From Swiss-Prot:
It catalyses: tRNA(Lys) + L-lysine + ATP = L-lysyl-tRNA(Lys) + AMP + diphosphate. Mg(2+) 1 binds at residues 407, 414. Its main location: cytoplasm. This is Lysine--tRNA ligase. HAMAP family: Lys_tRNA_synth_class2. One of its GO terms (molecular function) is magnesium ion binding. Mg(2+) 2 binds at residue 414. Pfam families: tRNA-synt_2 (PF00152), tRNA_anti-codon (PF01336). The keyword Zinc does not apply.
């Protein structure tokens, strides 16, 4: 693991530190200020004299910073070091005249990637750069693996995901994306709390998977000697809480689906689901628009965003029915979509994976996915979903073949799914039976029968509307990320050879970032 030549060279320097009485993994620091705050606090000095050769210690406030070394420029008895902490990069000037004989050891052992603690005072160099004039320097952590040079040594996309810790060090844009993600999640919580919703937590391990049409992960509970399923959605437990008397609840957590991976799907993903008693799906459409307006205001985002080279106008929101979208947006003939046999023949002629066993609603769903979804660029609510593909949604009073349901599409991707909840226990029981038949016929994504949930409904659930929003896709949208892996810190990846072998096989190493001048 540590046999690489460059690693061995660094280990020797670490051992030299120990021989000289220095701990290469020191614990205590004297940090007083972040790099960002240092630059802000002393920015006024840039307007004053920048002569760094004079003795400026008198009446100077001593500050202490910490961070990772990103660049070293050696100049005989002095050097300049770029130090990076979470807030930014600050330059330190280090001279033998200030730190004495320690300078010689530091010159021998300090390398790019090491984490250091520098104490000194603010000054401006002759080139006009605000810096810290070092009085003491301590190596806090010796890095024994070289960093890639800028990003040239870590240009393999998969490697960036596997070694996210390196990606975060060398690519500030990646760090900013995840800071934005944190802000988005925080704003979402603020929004629902201000609306009077209560945040709750429901089980991650389910005895019966439910709440979505998806294939679950299966594990085994040794103490109980029973199989358990990682949850594919929290929906059925959240609606049990509505039965119990809570009227406005949300859960922001992880879901797991044992399915394929692509640019917009990860088997482990984050969602917020929220349920609102005595409301309808129309109320949720309004609430969703209010949520986006809240996010855009809090995050100071423009109403027009670029995502995946598409310009999205958030000032215009559209609502259109399912079949109407197939005709007007998908370009399908009304006579075809109104006839199950004609629709099946048409989809087969387009070489889609359909067959006679599929329900009419399932065929409509296949047509929608193929001909409509990718064309929904500006925010669009699709309503009046086929009842066959909406097993947990309430039937529409005027047309029992469709559900009181919507999905929100932005940038050609599904962002949210909401509906007026089915609260008729007998109807729900019959739909579960239909789902069970579909599963027996080979539909691995069909839902399981959950009699306890039906029994909960039998106690009476008030009219309720519920919705789920994918956090990862939302962050992709607002950060202009091209793949879901760019917004998940540690995404699921295919197994590969040892990470250590991969990273150390790179030739462009950080040693090139140490510049020596006579």
């Amino acid at each position: 693991m540590f046999s690489n030549f460059y690693v061995q060279q660094r280990i020797k320097k670490m051992e030299l530190m120990r021989q000289e009485g220095f701990n290469p993994y020191a614990n205590k620091t004297t940090r007083t200020i972040s790099n960002y705050n240092f630059l802000n606090k002393y920015n006024h000095l840039k307007m004053q004299s920048s002569d760094d050769t004079q003795d400026c210690t008198q009446n100077k406030e001593i500050e202490s910073i910490v961070g990772r070394v990103r660049f070293i420029r050696l100049m005989g008895k002095a050097c300049f070091i770029k130090i990076q902490d979470e807030s930014g990069i600050l330059q330190a000037y280090v001279s033998k005249n200030d730190i004495g004989e320690d300078f010689l050891l530091i010159k021998k052992v300090l390398e790019v990637g090491d984490i250091i603690n520098v104490s000194g005072y603010a000054f401006v160099t002759k080139t006009g750069e605000l810096s810290i004039h070092t009085l003491t320097l301590q190596i806090l952590t010796k890095s024994i693996v070289p960093l890639p040079e800028k990003f040239h040594g870590l240009n393999d996309i998969e490697l960036r995901y596997r070694q996210r810790y390196v990606d975060l060090i060398v690519n500030n844009k990646v760090k900013e994306t995840f800071k934005l993600r944190s802000q988005i999640v925080s704003c979402i919580r603020q929004f629902f709390e201000q609306k009077g919703f209560l945040e709750v937590e429901t089980p991650m391990l389910h005895s019966i998977p439910g709440g979505a049409n998806a294939r679950p992960f299966i594990t085994h509970h040794n103490a109980l000697d029973v199989d358990r399923y990682l949850r594919i959605a929290p929906e059925l437990y959240l609606k049990r809480l509505i039965v119990g008397g809570f009227e406005a609840i949300f859960e922001l957590n992880r879901n797991f689906r044992n399915e394929g991976m692509d640019h917009s799907h990860n088997p482990e993903f984050s969602m917020i689901e929220f349920y609102w008693a005595y409301k309808t799906y129309e109320d949720l459409i309004t609430l969703t628009q209010e949520l986006f307006a809240f996010l855009f205001k809090k995050l100071n985002l423009p109403h027009s965003l670029i995502h995946d080279e598409l310009e999205i106008d958030f000032s215009q929101w559209h609502i259109i029915g399912y079949k109407e979208a197939l005709i007007k947006i998908g370009g399908l003939d009304k006579n075809i979509i109104d006839n199950q046999d004609a629709l099946l023949s048409f989809l087969m002629s387009k070489h889609l994976k359909v067959d006679k066993s599929m329900s009419y609603g399932k065929l409509l769903g296949e047509a929608f996915d193929e001909f409509v979804e990718h064309k929904l660029i500006n925010p669009t609510f699709i309503t009046q979903y086929p009842i066959e593909i909406s097993p947990l949604a309430r039937r529409n009073d005027e047309n029992p073949n469709v559900a009181d349901r919507f999905e929100l599409f932005i940038g050609g991707k599904e962002i949210a799914n909401g509906f007026s909840e089915l609260n008729d226990p007998i109807d729900q029981f019959e739909r579960f039976k239909e789902q069970a038949k579909a599963k027996d016929a080979g539909d691995e994504e069909a839902q399981y029968m959950d009699e306890d949930y039906v029994w909960a409904l039998a106690h009476g659930m008030p009219p309720t509307a519920g919705e789920g929003i994918g956090i990862d896709r939302l962050v992709m949208l607002l950060s202009n990320a091209k793949t879901i892996k760019d917004v998940i810190l540690f995404p699921a990846l295919k197994p590969t050879k040892s990470n250590f072998d991969i990273i150390l096989s790179q030739d462009a190493l950080s040693n090139a970032q140490i510049i020596k001048e006579n």
